[in-house]
Amino acid sequence: MKKQEQLSINSKIEFAMGKYNYVFCNTPDDKMPPKIRLNHCQAWTQDFAGFTVLWSYNTTVAVYDKIYCTLYDVLRCVYGYTATSAKHIAKFRNMYNPAHVLTYREV
């Protein structure tokens, strides 16, 4: 993949995360959807209007956009790479079977 292509993907991911952060930050605590455990892992999913979030431990590592059937893998953006969180994302991806998967990578 060329540098420009990855920069374009990173830009799309940052835009999607901006939408997610807006909804998350503007949802009152009493209206916050419950976290549901992913299999028997230290990972949870949380459904919001239009998207589902994957939390690995206490970090948002992926966002699935239900409208566009796109999975945004933000692990490397928010934390760096860990094998455990990558496994959580793989399970999450298999659960939703998205049409598109976009992965944030440093350029």
What is each PLM-predicted segment?
Residues 1-107:
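Terminal leader/tail segments of proteins
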